Amino acid sequence: METLFNGTLALAGRDQETTGFAWWAGNARLINLSGKLLGAHVAHAGLIVFWAGAMNLFEVAHFVPEKPMYEQGLILLPHLATLGWGVGPGGEVIDTFPYFVSGVLHLISSAVLGFGGIYHSLLGPETLEESFPFFGYVWKDRNKMTTILGIHLILLGIGAFLLVLKALYFGGVYDTWAPGGGDVRKITNLTLSPSVIFGYLLKSPFGGEGWIVSVDDLEDIIGGHVWLGSICIFGGIWHILTKPFAWARRALVWSGEAYLSYSLAALSIFGFTACCFVWFNNTAYPSEFYGPTGPEASQAQAFTFLVRDQRLGANVGSAQGPTGLGKYLMRSPTGEVIFGGETMRFWDLRAPWLEPLRGPNGLDLSRLKKDIQPWQERRSAEYMTHAPLGSLNSVGGVATEINAVNYVSPRSWLATSHFVLGFFLFVGHLWHAGRARAAAAGFEKGIDRDLEPVLFMTPLN
C-alpha cells in the first residue's frame, strides 16, 4: 500500500522508501520485523500498566473514606473493592493500604515492561526467527499462528482461574447480596451445572431475560469463570498440539493484518458486552461502589416516597395515581405487584435492598407495611439522588432536578467509554478486514491516484 506523504522522518533506516509506510503508519513498518514489533507491544503494555498504577495511586491520594466511591469519580478503586480488598460490611472501606499496594505493584511492573520495550525497540535483534526460533514467526505459518493462539488462550484461562482462587481461598470477594446490605465472603458452593452456566448464553438479550448480563449471584459468576478458564486452557492446549484443518486454511485469511482484524472484532464484542454489563448488572458491579443502575435509582425513588407517604398515613395499597393506575403499587402484565408510576417500566429490577420485601407474587404489602429496615430506607434515598445520568461537562443528575448535585456516575463513564471504544474497534475491524481480504485477493493497491476525481476539478478560487 503506497502512502503519499512526507518520508523525511526516518528511524534506523526504516523510512518510507524501504518499508512502503510513512512514519505515521506506526507499527505497519514493523510487520515483518518480529523483534521490533515485540518491542512495540511490550512498550505499549508498559504504558497501559503505567497508567493503571499511576491512576490507582491518584485515586488513593484523592480518596475520602467518608464519601461513597461513586461520588468521587473513581473507576479503579471500585474494581479493587469488588474483589474484596479493603472493604467490610455494607461496602464500607476499612483499609486503603491494599489499594496503595496495587498501585505500587503496577508502577514497578510498568518499569520492567518499559525497559523491555525500549530494549527490544532499539537494541534487541530486528527479527527473532534466527536466534530465538521459539519466539520467532512468519505470519503465513498457520501452525505457528495457532500455537501462539493456544498460548494466549492458556494465559486467559489462568486469568479466569485467578479470580476463582481469590473468591474461594484468598479472602473471598464482595457480595452485594450478603444479608444486611453486602459483605466480603468466600464463595463455597460454586455453580458448575452446565445447564445453568450455558443457559445464560442461550437467553434472549431483551428485558426480563438479559442474556449473560442477567447473572445475579456470585456462585454463578465464579462457576462461570471455572468453566471459561477450563475451556480456554483446554482449547489452548488443543490449538498448540494441532494444525488448522483444511476448511479453516481455506476459509480464513492468514496474514498479520487479518489477525489484527480478528482481534479487533473480538475486542469490539468485549467492549459492547462490558458496556451492557456495567450499565445493568449490580452483582458483578455492586452499586455500593459504582452507584445504582438507572432502573435501580428509579425504583429507589418510588420506594423512598412510598416510605414517606406511608408514614404520613397514605394507604399505599389502594391509593390511586393521576392516571387511574395505582399511585405507589400496581400489577405488572404478568400479575406481580410492582411499584407504580413512571418506574413501572423498570419492574424487572432486582436489588439487594429491595428483594427482602418481595413475596411469591411480587412486592408483599404486609412486608412493605411492617418490615422495612432503616438501612433499606437510607440506601434507597442515597440511590435515588445518584442516578447514573450526566453529561460530558460533569453536570450530573436529572436535568430537571433543582436540587441536583454535581455528580456523574462511574457507571455512566464506564458504560459510555466502553460503548465508544467498542464502536471504534468495530470500525477498525472492518477497515483492517477489508484491507487484509483485498491484499489476499491481490488488489491492495487501492484507488489509482492518477484517476483521482479531485485532480480533474477546477480550483476553488
UniProtKB/Swiss-Prot annotation:
Propeptide: 1-2
Subcellular location: Plastid, Chloroplast thylakoid membrane
Keywords on record: Acetylation, Chlorophyll, Chloroplast, Chromophore, Manganese, Membrane, Metal-binding, Phosphoprotein, Photosynthesis, Photosystem II, Plastid, Thylakoid, Transmembrane, Transmembrane helix
Transmembrane portions of the chain: 57-81, 122-143, 166-188, 243-263, 279-300, 435-459
Residues the record lists as N-acetylthreonine modifications: T3
Membrane topology (UniProt): Multi-pass membrane protein
Signal peptide per UniProt: none
Main location: plastid
GO cellular component: chloroplast thylakoid membrane; photosystem II
Textual note on the cofactor: Binds multiple chlorophylls and provides some of the ligands for the Ca-4Mn-5O cluster of the oxygen-evolving complex. It may also provide a ligand for a Cl- that is required for oxygen evolution. PSII binds additional chlorophylls, carotenoids and specific lipids.
Molecular function as annotated in GO: chlorophyll binding; electron transporter, transferring electrons within the cyclic electron transport pathway of photosynthesis activity; metal ion binding
Record-listed [CaMn4O5] cluster binding positions: E355
Entry-annotated residues carrying Phosphothreonine: T3
An example Gene Ontology biological process: photosynthetic electron transport in photosystem II
InterPro entries in alphabetical order: PS_antenna-like, PS_II_antenna-like_sf, PSII_PsbC, PSII_PsbC_sf
Function, in words: One of the components of the core complex of photosystem II (PSII). It binds chlorophyll and helps catalyze the primary light-induced photochemical processes of PSII. PSII is a light-driven water:plastoquinone oxidoreductase, using light energy to abstract electrons from H(2)O, generating O(2) and a proton gradient subsequently used for ATP formation.
Family (UniProt): Belongs to the PsbB/PsbC family. PsbC subfamily.
UniProt subunit comment: PSII is composed of 1 copy each of membrane proteins PsbA, PsbB, PsbC, PsbD, PsbE, PsbF, PsbH, PsbI, PsbJ, PsbK, PsbL, PsbM, PsbT, PsbX, PsbY, PsbZ, Psb30/Ycf12, at least 3 peripheral proteins of the oxygen-evolving complex and a large number of cofactors. It forms dimeric complexes.
NCBIfam families the record matches: psbC
Name this polypeptide is given: Photosystem II CP43 reaction center protein
Organism, as annotated: Nandina domestica
Encoding gene per record: psbC
